Amino acid sequence: MNGFRNSSRNGQVWRYQSAGSRAVILEVSGRWMEAAEAWRRAAGVAPRTDWQQFARKRAEQCHRRCRGRV
């Protein structure tokens, strides 16, 4: 074991955090459609299943908000 797997996991976590952070910023500023896309992107790079589910759920909620259904 040379630590590659660990650093690879850290990279995945960093990418998810980065994508999620952008999604939150868009969500807070009221840009729902863009936030939904950002959450979908975050779900795609999430290293854990529960994180993927959370990101998909947020994407769906943002999509509903942009269509006027809260």
Where in this protein do the model-derived segments appear?
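Inward-facing hydrophobic residues that define packing positions of alpha-helical scaffold repeats
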Residues: 39-40, 46
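Alpha-helical linker/edge segments of TPR/alpha-solenoid repeat scaffolds
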Residues: 60-70
